[in-house]
Amino acid sequence: MTEIQKLTNNKEIIAYLAEKFPLCFSLEGEAKPLKIGLFQDLAEALANDEKVSKTQLRQALRQYTSNWRYLHGCRAGAVRVDLNGEPAGILEQEHVEHAAAKLAEAKAKVAERRAVEKANNPKANKKRSVHHSGNKSENKKSAGKKFSNPRQVEQIFVNVDLANLQKGDVVRVKAGDKTTKAEILEVVKEGARVELENGLILTVSADRLFA
């Protein structure tokens, strides 16, 4: 008898749901608003499925409906869908406003985190400058060699969550010891297609994408 392999995290469960109900759930692009009460339909549809439990389904749904892809799709006039992708009512205005507020809150947190990181870097760079201020000629030489771009030395980048990326988002792409700004063109499996500032388009893995 083959042993059932249980799914252990939300990402695996969401991928499983997208495989079982592709017209309802998606892993890329804008997500469709879900039917009110979909959890009950889902629990009944997977009642005999030993891979997932109701508790896991509830947690995975909570994560799915709170990511940026889903919140972007909750706009005025959007149509909810059931497990089969069939229309299940127009999104109510209060839910549109709630989604917009959640999205703004999430983006504000990211912006705040970036601001804190940016604010911390000049302080570190200033300490380095004071430490080396004894000899002007040596300072100039050091600035040319070691500190020509202190941000690259000091700045700490945070890996982005692919589930939160949208087309048009601006990220940083790491190439060796350097990073460059890029715009997301498409989120793909385990990475994203991006356009660099010089116009070059390429696909990069998730571990090279930073906020």
Curated annotation (Swiss-Prot):
One of its GO terms (molecular function) is RNA strand annealing activity. Pfam families: ProQ (PF04352), ProQ_C (PF17516). RNA chaperone with significant RNA binding, RNA strand exchange and RNA duplexing activities. Gene3D superfamilies: ProQ/FinO domain. Residues 124-134 have a biased composition (Basic residues). It is found in: Cytoplasm. This is RNA chaperone ProQ. Belongs to the ProQ family. It comes from Histophilus somni (strain 2336). One of its GO terms (biological process) is post-transcriptional regulation of gene expression. Disulfide bonds: none annotated. Its main location: cytoplasm. Keywords: Chaperone, Cytoplasm, RNA-binding. The keyword Chaperone applies. GO terms for cellular component: cytosol. InterPro entries: ProQ, ProQ/FinO, ProQ/FinO_sf, ProQ_C. Residues 112-148 are annotated as: Disordered.
